């Protein structure tokens, strides 16, 4: 299972590579989304491609892609890695979802198919999702005192 530092490193690496580029296409190759339908919100999202990739960030183990679509509307893609997920720049047997960008393609791989992807155009829902994950131990100012308060 990818741990917090691995998720953070992946988000930072993706942000370095694709921030500011255009997302041209989202392709489903295999896995849960090929069998059970596209990720929630994807059909509406892809209607307005290309979309500018504003950022790739993380909060805990949640990876958050922020886009600005061709109609100047903001979208977010929420991604969790599950037990075996991650992003690669080369297609592999388990490269289930492909993001085609002006800086190349990036593949979401997930051998066990426990990870999730969801497209959302609601900033309040995105903020609520982030808040529901609790403090981010790599970003938030976490002290021993705050930790003790949270567990009381």
Where is each model-derived feature located?
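Phosphate/anion-contacting hairpin/loop surfaces
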Residues: 72-152
